[in-house]
Curated annotation (Swiss-Prot):
Pfam families noted in UniProt: MoCF_biosynth (PF00994), MoeA_C (PF03454), MoeA_N (PF03453)
InterPro entries: MoaB/Mog-like_dom_sf, MoaB/Mog_dom, MoeA-like, MoeA_C_domain_IV, MoeA_C_domain_IV_sf, MoeA_linker/N, MoeA_linker/N_sf
Entry protein name: Molybdopterin molybdenumtransferase
UniProt lineage: Bacteria, Bacillati, Bacillota, Bacilli, Bacillales
Reactions the enzyme catalyzes: adenylyl-molybdopterin + molybdate = Mo-molybdopterin + AMP + H(+)
One annotated GO molecular function: metal ion binding
Protein family: Belongs to the MoeA family.
GO biological process: Mo-molybdopterin cofactor biosynthetic process
EC top class, as a word: transferase
Gene coding for it: moeA
Residue ranges of the TM segments: none
Function text: Catalyzes the insertion of molybdate into adenylated molybdopterin with the concomitant release of AMP.
A Gene Ontology term for the protein's cellular component: cytoplasm
Known EC number: 2.10.1.1
Amino acid sequence: MLEKRTPIPVDEAVRRVCHFQKQGETEWVALEDSLHRFLAEDITADHHVPAFDRSPYDGFAVRACDTAEASRENPVRFEVIDHIGAGAVSEKELGPFQAVRIMTGAQIPEGADAVVMIELTQAFEENGKSFMSLKRRFQTGDNISKTGEDAQKGSVLLTKGTRVTPGVTALLATFGYASVPVVRKPVVGIIATGTELLNVSDPLEPGKIRNSNASMVYAQAIEAGATPLYLGKISDELDKSFAAVKEAMKKVDFLITTGGVSVGDFDFLPAIYEKLGADVLFNKVAMRPGSVTTVAHANDMLLFGLSGNPSACYVGFELFVKPIIQTWLLNETPHSICAEAVLTKDFPKPNPFTRFVRALVHHQEGKLLATPVGLDKSSSVTSLADANAFIILPGGTRGYESGRTVQVLLIREENGSEWPWSVLSRSSKL
């Protein structure tokens, strides 16, 4: 176990955590339960879509060659010999100057090679027979959805790691996936430490605070794609805390503890990691908030020791835990996207370490604007409610003025980044 707390750069801390990343195994779920899950394997087309030539419009199926002389001055008439809707197939084959009334989605009948939209025709009856006339020529293939034009048999439709959206469910249903192969969600255990913690429903008491971190991390875990398992809060007693952590490790894929990672008299996580024989990857990161964030590895499991301060806990989860969950789910871009934004108000604080300022980012006139929200203190809760990004201010800088371009991590975006830290490393040298 590391005894000395030597801060390491943020990107190095992320790299150490990612060294122990895993990929989850496959489970099958009903199509209706697959929304927001991640595909565990590639989905390949087992048939063409469309599976047959079909009409994209309501109209008439004709032979294009019969329209060659059609014009305003010389309308060409066709005998309508059949009428078919979607799901029906005409048993008749078209001869010269014959047409079949066809509905959207219906299969093109034998002999036809073009579809005339109904609004371009004039229908009429003559001697008990149905006819239509048109005044323009058509080419072979006009207004026909060709077999396989949407998807070819054998083509890869979706790659593993794809997040299931409503559009993806439509594609899965098209190819008969009543059950869908998805990645099993990792179970993320959550333990809150601290004698000062009250349950959310408890009335306030002198010297006590409500346990907001557990609810926050629980929600973050769901948003990241995991199954959270709240394992309760434990008091600042070493033996009880150790027993609780050891028991929790039997039930989860990853374990998060909040609080107890600093150097106070009742911060027992370092001692717990030592008793577990854990390999401590780091116990101090050169960042604000969350410098005391600690991550260890024991029994093939990552143990995340997040700060007890809400903002620091929140940042620690987004930077270190979320990418591990996303990688488990086969997401090849598991990190938050890094982008440039314009700072909208002064931020005078010095930055001895890299600072992650909770911010609200929005688009305006083709630019991203970033506005710090709430108090920039690790204990702040109010700054988290409106934040959709972190402004990254490199260590060693002092104060940023409104109008300056800064780097931001977009933490609410569904899409991710493969590795944003090289950009941040460059920005710290500017």
